[in-house]
């Protein structure tokens, strides 16, 4: 399916409704850095669609609201340390109960139901790992963020303001790298079926709609404008990495970036699409 390439863009698995996905490369990288950062990796996506998949090929939910990303990365949970310890202990007890009940059910299920249960248990185990990591990092304070940066980044940005939205998300990524709170991000800026229109440059069609151009010069012009706009937002991210320094120097010198798409346009006459 030409529209379903996004889930396998970072996994290299076979695409298709019945195919099983694999782990995405960002997660393999995140595993290597996990002991050194509060968050091994973060998945972002403007439509909520993700590029990140765990070792069982299950999608890792992507956050799409800048304010929620800021809160997760840079805001300490309310109630102080002792309240946080109680909440984490409570979460751990609930997870133990859920896993225990699930194991009992597993002995009574058929193969198809067991497969669904395995996927559910994988999600539960991931929550368990995150809970354990949160406990490990509980006594380590989060980085202090200036008031000006907080005002700039801890806010809702309407997705209709596409440029501001993308730049805010990119700024959050740069700040996370600068403070070393995580070293791995994925950011889905629009998949084959849901690329957003860009009103600020008078493009009211989605990129998916524009890709059905059938050689029409006007549609091709608009498609080019859409792509240039998206490349400019990514260039902003690269510029910010070049401007900001941490203890090792400019962030750009210690950052690897991959940008691309899994489908050029739907009018390709063959299924041999470029990555």
Q: Which functions belong to the PLM regions below?
A:
Residues 2-142:
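A contiguous, mid-domain pocket- or channel-lining segment that forms the substrate-recognition surface
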Residues 32-35, 176-178, 243-252:
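Surface-exposed acidic, glycine-flexible loop patches that form ligand/cofactor-binding
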Residues 40-44, 183-188, 209, 257-260:
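Structural recognition of the beta-strand scaffold that forms the well-ordered cores
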Residues 49-51, 192-197, 267:
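Flexible loop/turn segments at secondary-structure boundaries
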Residues 103-107, 115, 212-253:
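A long, amphipathic alpha-helix that forms part
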Residues 117-197:
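Extended, H/D-rich, highly charged conserved domains that either
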Residues 188-227:
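Contiguous alpha-helical scaffold segments within structured protein domains
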Residues 264-275:
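Single conserved hydrophobic/aromatic residue that forms the stacking wall/gate
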């Amino acid at each position: 399916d030409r529209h379903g390439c996004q889930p396998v863009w970072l996994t290299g698995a076979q695409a298709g409704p019945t195919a099983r996905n694999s782990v995405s490369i960002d997660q393999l990288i995140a595993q290597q850095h996990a002991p050194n950062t509060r968050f091994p990796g973060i998945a972002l996506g403007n439509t909520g669609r993700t590029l990140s998949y765990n070792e069982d090929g299950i999608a890792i939910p992507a956050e799409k609201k800048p304010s929620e990303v800021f809160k997760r990365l840079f805001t300490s949970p309310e109630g102080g340390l002792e309240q946080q310890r109680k909440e984490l202990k409570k979460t751990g007890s609930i997870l133990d109960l859920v896993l225990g009940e699930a194991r009992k059910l597993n002995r009574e299920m058929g193969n198809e139901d067991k497969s669904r249960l395995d996927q559910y248990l994988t999600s539960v185990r991931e929550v368990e790992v995150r809970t354990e990591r949160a406990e490990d990092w509980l006594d380590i304070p989060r980085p202090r963020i200036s008031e000006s940066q907080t005002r700039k980044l801890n806010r809702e940005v309407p997705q209709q303001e596409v440029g501001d939205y993308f730049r805010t998300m990119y700024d959050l990524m740069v700040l996370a790298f600068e403070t070393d709170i995580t070293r791995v991000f994925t950011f889905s800026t629009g998949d084959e079926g849901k690329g957003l229109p860009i009103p600020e440059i008078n493009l009211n069609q989605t990129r998916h709609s524009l890709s059905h151009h059938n050689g029409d010069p006007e549609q091709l012009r608009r498609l080019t404008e859409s792509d240039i706009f998206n490349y400019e937002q990514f260039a902003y991210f690269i510029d910010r990495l070049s401007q900001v320094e941490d203890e090792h120097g400019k962030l750009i010198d210690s950052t690897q970036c991959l940008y691309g798409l899994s489908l050029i346009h739907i009018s390709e006459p063959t299924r041999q699409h470029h990555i």
